[in-house]
Structure formats: structure tokens, C-alpha cells
């Protein structure tokens, strides 16, 4: 645990001194900070309960990530042959397939797929899972993992079909029931999702899924009297007494315009209609349990508080585009985008800049009192309102620097590399040739040059 002089803390797996710098490791990535900015280093302790974005847990935007825990009976015998030295052996896969034993071959491809899933190479993972299903199309475990992959890559409609097949193949699988619940929730089948999740926790208690059931039940209660309208890319749910027809029409028009703009900016489109739910302020906080400083939530559904609004105000327009941008980013990055990059891009495309706060940020970076960017990979929900404001500003500053220096196209390439399995820092290195440490130094110079110190 590294205690910084600015009062912040970094949780690291390994720490070492290197001259004037302190180097530390988090996962596969290494970082360096000036020794002069460190107050002390302590061994032990338990990290705070949030996950880095490389693990894709983003509670205020997406449902908690669920990874199945099942295995196949031949896995233990094959695992070391299929994966060794950290890589899948394609020759071993070919040799296994030549034996002409469907169960053995399916297991080999399944092992390879799980390895690539853990490494973040979701495209290769998909190919291996599909190969496994060619040899065992009704294997509930493979179907469950494949459905989980489809959810991770924002293809919930297809995930419903595969998860349903998994449940029909093995109704007593808690993993299959859980994944089916996720897929149903993401495709606006909330009642069905609750039933599936309840079956899952009956088979195997799970506190996280119990919380999802409670959230879904709050949603159903809040939206019991809601009506619905659809446009080309959106499904709008609303309470008639809370919104006028003119506001609903203007909202859909604004969202469709934002959708087209984001397709041009980011070069990708979500695979299915996006659900937008309009709440009174109280219902919004009742359903989402979001912190008081949040203006909206995108947890796979855009949840927007609109108390007292009769038109699409400039503030509401920015919120709509910000939250919609998260849906596009999730699609491109396979749900793996770190929080700082996700929030930075969403702010940039509102559009917003740090112009009004640039001088203050320049001073913070100049005196090394900023929040280290690598610690902003995880969810901002753990921050106080003041810390969250700084985290959002730093995120926007970093993304604004990348955009103004290298262009928006490099932001898109960073997202694509993350979606292909790269860590955030590896994606930065392969596009703008910067580590996190380099990026912080470059952002500091950018802010001082643009806004003064």
C-alpha cells in the first residue's frame, strides 16, 4: 500500500525503488511515480472493494460481471497440453481434433476459449467456443460460457438464445440460470430475468445475484404504470403524468441525432435498440441507488431523472449524449474500457472541455497532487462528491489531450485495442506510445501550456 503525500493511496501487488522513482505492479502492468511524492509504503492490507476496468466491473454503468464457474470432466487431463507457457498451443488442438472424439475435442476448444477469455482476447475466445459447440452443440457448460461472452460483447439478444439452450440442456445449472437472467434483463425482459435469477439462487445462494433481484424488483415497482414509445434505435419508457408528448418526441429526436453523430465519431453501432427510462427524481434514486452527485445512469439501460422538465434543456442534452456514448464505448471495447477513458470520452463528445477548470488542474498536476490516472481505472462510485469531480476533470483532461494531440481516431483505436484484449496501458503504448506515467507527464505539460500553472 503506497501512501502519497497528497493523501491518496495506491494498492499495488509489488513495490520496488529505482533511483528517484518508486516502481509498482498492478496486474500485468508496471508504473513509476517520483519517490518525492511518496510519504510511506506499507505491506499488507486489503484493497478497497472495486474492480479495475480490465475486469470490466462497472456497477454504475453495467451490471456486475458474472463469469460462470463450471468445467468439463476432461478439463484436468487436457489443460496442460492445450495451454502452456501462457499461450494456447494450436498444434495440440489440431492433434486432439484428429483423434475423432467429439467430447475430447470440444473440451480442448473450451479450455482454449476460457484461456483467451481470461486474457481478454474476446474475438479469439469466440472462435474457440464456437468450435467447441460444433462438436458438442448441447453442452450446457459451453453454452453458458458462450452466452456470457455474448453478453460481454454487448450481444444480449443472441445471448438469450444460447443461455436458454443451456438451461434446457441442464435446468439444474445455477450458472446457466444466472446468465439467462442477465441476458433477459439486458433485453428488457425484467420479469423473466427475476424468475431466472431466483432459480439460480435457489440452486446456489449468491449475494450478488440477490442484489440484482432486488434492483430488478425495484425497477418493476417504479415502472408499473409506465408506457412505451419506439424510434429507429431507441425504446423510451415513461410515466405519462411525468412527461409531455412534446418532451418525449424531442427526447427521441435528440437521441437519434446523437446516435448518428456518435456513429460518425466512433465508427461503431450498438447491436440492438437501447432502452431509455424516464423517472421522477425520487423514482430514479429508488431504482438505481446511485450516489447523490450522479445525473444519470447507464447500466445497460439509460436511466434519466427528468423531474420538472418540459423540454430538452442544454443540460439534459449533454446528459443524454454522455450516457449514450457509454453504450457505444461498451460495444467497441467489449465492456473493458477503464473508467477514466470511458468518462473522459463521454465528456469530450457531449461536447465538454476542461477550459473552466484548466488552471486549477494545471496547478494540481504541477504539484503532483492529482489522482494517479492508473487508479482511475475503477469505478468512481467509491469517491466523495469532491473526489468524483476531480476524477471526472482529470479523465476529461487526459482524453482532451489525446484528442487535441493525436486526433479522435486514436481514441477509437485505443478502444478497439482494449476490445481485442489489450490492457489499457498496452493500448496506450501501441497507439500514442505512452505508458500511464508518460501520459500523466504529458497531460501535466499540456495543461500548463494551455492554461498556465
Where are these regions (language model features)?
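TPR alpha-solenoid repeat register
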Residues: 108, 142, 176, 209-210
Amino acid at each position: 500500500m503506497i501512501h502519497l503525500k497528497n493523501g491518496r493511496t495506491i494498492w499495488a501487488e509489488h513495490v520496488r525503488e529505482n533511483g528517484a522513482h518508486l516502481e509498482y505492479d498492478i496486474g500485468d502492468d508496471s508504473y513509476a511515480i517520483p519517490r518525492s511524492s511518496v510519504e510511506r509504503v506499507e505491506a499488507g492490507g486489503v484493497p478497497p472493494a472495486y474492480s479495475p476496468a480490465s475486469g470490466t466491473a462497472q456497477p454504475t454503468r453495467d451490471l456486475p460481471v458474472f463469469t460462470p464457474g463450471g468445467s468439463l470432466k476432461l478439463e484436468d487431463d487436457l489443460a496442460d497440453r492445450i495451454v502452456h507457457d501462457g499461450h494456447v498451443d494450436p498444434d495440440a488442438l489440431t492433434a486432439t481434433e484428429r483423434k475423432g472424439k467429439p467430447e475430447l475435442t470440444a473440451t480442448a476448444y473450451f479450455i482454449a476459449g476460457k484461456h483467451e477469455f481470461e486474457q481478454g482476447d474476446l474475438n479469439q475466445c469466440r472462435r474457440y467456443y464456437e468450435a467447441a459447440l460444433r462438436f458438442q452443440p448441447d453442452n450446457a457448460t459451453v453454452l453458458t460460457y458462450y452466452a456470457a461472452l455474448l453478453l460481454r460483447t454487448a450481444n444480449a439478444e443472441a445471448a438469450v438464445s444460447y443461455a436458454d439452450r443451456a438451461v434446457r440442456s441442464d435446468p439444474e445449472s445455477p450458472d446457466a440460470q444466472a446468465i439467462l437472467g442477465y441476458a433477459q434483463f439486458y433485453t428488457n425482459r425484467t420479469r423473466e430475468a427475476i424468475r431466472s435469477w431466483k432459480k439460480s439462487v435457489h440452486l446456489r445462494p449468491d449475494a450478488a445475484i440477490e442484489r440484482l433481484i432486488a434492483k430488478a424488483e425495484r425497477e418493476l415497482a417504479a415502472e408499473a404504470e409506465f408506457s412505451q414509445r419506439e424510434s429507429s434505435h431507441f425504446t423510451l419508457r415513461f410515466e405519462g403524468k411525468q412527461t409531455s408528448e412534446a418532451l418525449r418526441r424531442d427526447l427521441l429526436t435528440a437521441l437519434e441525432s446523437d446516435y448518428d453523430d456518435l456513429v460518425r465519431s466512433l465508427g461503431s453501432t450498438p447491436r440492438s435498440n437501447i432502452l431509455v427510462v424516464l423517472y421522477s427524481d425520487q423514482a430514479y434514486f429508488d431504482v438505481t441507488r446511485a450516489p447523490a452527485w450522479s445525473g444519470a445512469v447507464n447500466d445497460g439501460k439509460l436511466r434519466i431523472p427528468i423531474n420538472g422538465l418540459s423540454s430538452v434543456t442544454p443540460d439534459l442534452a449533454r446528459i443524454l449524449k454522455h450516457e449514450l456514448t457509454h453504450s457505444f464505448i461498451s460495444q467497441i471495447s467489449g465492456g473493458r474500457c477503464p473508467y477514466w477513458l470511458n468518462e473522459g470520452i463521454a465528456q469530450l463528445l457531449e461536447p465538454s472541455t476542461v477550459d473552466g477548470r484548466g488552471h486549477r488542474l494545471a496547478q494540481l498536476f504541477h504539484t503532483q497532487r492529482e489522482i494517479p490516472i492508473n487508479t482511475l481505472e475503477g469505478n468512481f462510485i467509491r469517491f466523495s462528491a469532491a473526489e468524483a469531480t476531480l476524477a471526472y476533470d482529470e479523465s476529461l483532461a487526459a482524453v482532451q489531450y489525446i484528442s487535441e494531440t493525436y486526433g479522435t481516431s486514436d481514441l477509437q483505436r485505443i478502444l478497439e485495442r482494449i476490445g481485442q484484449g489489450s490492457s489499457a496501458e498496452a493500448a496506450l503504448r501501441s497507439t500514442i506510445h505512452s505508458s500511464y506515467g508518460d501520459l500523466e507527464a504529458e497531460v501535466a505539460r499540456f495543461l500548463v501550456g494551455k492554461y498556465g500553472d
